[in-house]
Amino acid sequence: MKYSLKTVMSLVDHSGLKPYLREDEIARLIGEASEMGNYSVCIEPIYGNFAVEYIKEKGYSLKVDVTLDFPFGSLPTSARKKIIEDSVYADEIDMVIPIGYVKSHRWDKVEQDINDVVSTARDLGLVSKIITEDGYLTLDEKLKTYDIVIRSAPDFIKTSTGFADKEFCKSLGNETGATPENVKLMSEIAKKIGSNIGIKAAGGIHTYDQVEKIIDSAGMIPEPSNIRLGMSGTKKLYEEMKKASVQQS
C-alpha cells in the first residue's frame, strides 16, 4: 500500500540520540521535526527540559520523547523506576528491556521489571515504549520477550535502539535495527493475545521502501497511536518523498 508524505511524517519520532550532540543541534532537530510534520522528537533526557521549553517558546505542536536506560538496559529496576519519575516533564519514554535478564532467561525478573516500569510510567501519565533490541535475541527469546512485553501493556513495543552491537547480532544470524519480519511477529503475537498495543520500528530506517514494508507488516491503520517510526535520517526521507511526489504530479 502507498502512503502519503504527510501520513509517513506524522508517524515519525525524529531522533537525535548521539551522545555528543550539542544543545543547538537539538534545537535544529526540533525545528526540522516541526517543519516536516513529525509526531515527536526523541532525545536523550539530558536535553528533555530544554526541548519542552524550546517547543513551548516556538509554539510547535510536538511531543517530547526521552530514551531511558538507553541503549543497554542495564540498570536495576529501582533505578529504572526512579529515572521514569524524573522524566515527568516529557510526554513519552522509550525504555530498553533488561537485556541481561533476557539473555539469562530469568523470565521472572524480566516480567517483574517490565510490569514495574510500565505501571510507573502509566501512573505518571507517560506514554511508554519498551525496546526489545531484536538483534540480540534468538527466535525463542523474541517469542518469549514479545509476549511478556505485550502482556505488561505498555503503549508501544519497539524493535530496537539503533545502537546494537553489529558483530553480536551477526553471530546470531540477525540484522540490526527494524525489520518487517520482526514487526509482523510483534503484530501477530499482539493479535493472539488480544492486545491493541502500538508498534514502533526504529534502527536503520532510511528509505520509503523500508517504511512501506514496515507499515504493511504491522497490519494497522497508519496513525501515531498505532505505529511509530524512529528515525534520525528523517530529513533525507522527507526530501526523497517530496521529490517523488512532485515528479508524479
From Swiss-Prot:
The active site is at D94, K158, K200. One of its GO terms (cellular component) is cytoplasm. It is found in: Cytoplasm. Its main location: cytoplasm. Keywords: Cytoplasm, Lyase, Schiff base. One of its GO terms (molecular function) is deoxyribose-phosphate aldolase activity. One of its GO terms (biological process) is deoxyribonucleotide catabolic process. It catalyses: 2-deoxy-D-ribose 5-phosphate = D-glyceraldehyde 3-phosphate + acetaldehyde. InterPro entries: Aldolase_TIM (IPR013785), DeoC (IPR011343), DeoC/FbaB/LacD_aldolase (IPR002915), DeoC_typeI (IPR028581). It comes from the Archaea. SMART domains: DeoC. Pathway: Carbohydrate degradation; 2-deoxy-D-ribose 1-phosphate degradation; D-glyceraldehyde 3-phosphate and acetaldehyde from 2-deoxy-alpha-D-ribose 1-phosphate: step 2/2. CDD domains: DeoC. Its EC number is 4.1.2.4. Belongs to the DeoC/FbaB aldolase family. DeoC type 1 subfamily. Catalyzes a reversible aldol reaction between acetaldehyde and D-glyceraldehyde 3-phosphate to generate 2-deoxy-D-ribose 5-phosphate. This is Deoxyribose-phosphate aldolase.
